[in-house]
Amino acid sequence: MKGIGTDIIEIERIELAVSRSGQQFLDRVFTAAEQEHCQGKVHSLAGRFAAKEAVLKALGTGLREMRWTNIEILPNHLGKPEVTLSGPALERAEKEGIHRILVSIAHDRGRAVAFAVAVGKEKEG
């Protein structure tokens, strides 16, 4: 394990950001594929936002030179969220020897919570 991160957010905060800034907020934080997957469902957007924050913490950095869209979180064929990094986020992961990042997302009582674990390559032998 190379790092861990967690985040919790009130779903209402994301709802407010969407109502205030609309598409500008969505485009700044979420990839086109994430937006298509969430279909405007605020709880899904909030879960992904929390997951991106958790991933940043697992990487051991804040946004700094990264963009929110350098971290993409989409479900695999079984519905499990999977992280895809690009640009500076991918460079940071490679520099730290991070092979993949596992995430878990949950929603309850008006909040979304996410947990991320950065995993290094398994040792052979």
Curated annotation (Swiss-Prot):
Domain of life of the source: Bacteria
Listed under GO biological process in this entry are:
fatty acid biosynthetic process
List localization entries: Cytoplasm
User: Where does this protein hold Mg(2+)?
Assistant: D7, E53
What's the Enzyme Commission number for this chain?
Answer: 2.7.8.7
Q: Which UniProt keywords apply?
A: Cytoplasm, Fatty acid biosynthesis, Fatty acid metabolism, Lipid biosynthesis, Lipid metabolism, Magnesium, Metal-binding, Transferase
Pfam families named among the record's database cross-references: ACPS (PF01648)
By its UniProt entry, which NCBIfam families does this protein fall under? acpS (TIGR00516), pantethn_trn (TIGR00556)
Known function: Transfers the 4'-phosphopantetheine moiety from coenzyme A to a Ser of acyl-carrier-protein.
Q: What is this protein called?
A: Holo-[acyl-carrier-protein] synthase
Which species is this UniProt entry from?
A: Desulforamulus reducens (strain ATCC BAA-1160 / DSM 100696 / MI-1) (Desulfotomaculum reducens)
Name of the gene encoding the protein in the UniProt record: acpS
